[in-house]
Amino acid sequence: MWEKVIETIAYLKSKGLRVDAIGWQAHLRINSLSKEELDYLDYLIDWAHTNNLEFHITELNLWVQDEITDLDSIQNVQSNIYQKLVNKLISKKNNGVIALNFWGLKDRNGRQKHNKNILSIYDRNLNPNPCLETIKSCFNNGE
């Protein structure tokens, strides 16, 4: 998919049109961000910065297909995934603009079978989820 995005951006720029950024809607699953996926993300961010584009991760959340029976386990997975992602962004901060946005602030039910539960940085009562502390820790350690 991203190769088509890169081709499209190159085409638009060749026509003299302005393109400022690439955005990735990061609706992640519990098996997201393998080493291969992180390596490709690394390539994509570098490509964006080399081509004077900002790189934005938008709509970050975790989609859980099944009913959550072990919330602690899922929150641990969420924290690990977010840690990988945030550390990747921090590693690129001196190369160009990067941005991180969330898709909603609190956990909620989804309306489709692939996202029965949508987890964010706060629980349904707006108490911080463990991943929020993980994100803060990444930023504090990445300065």
Positions of PLM-derived features:
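Aromatic-rich peripheral "rim/lid" segments of glycoside hydrolase catalytic domains that contact
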Residues: 33-143
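Surface-exposed cleft-lining segments at the edges of enzyme active sites
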Residues: 24-35
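Distinct, well-ordered alpha-helical segments
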Residues: 1-15, 34-41
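Short, conserved beta-strand edge motifs with alternating hydrophobic and charged residues
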Residues: 21-25, 56-59
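Short helix-capping segments at alpha-helix termini
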Residues: 14-18, 92-95
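Conserved residues at the C-terminal ends of beta-strands
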Residues: 18, 25, 103
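Short hydrophobic alpha-helical module
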Residues: 11-15, 25, 47-54
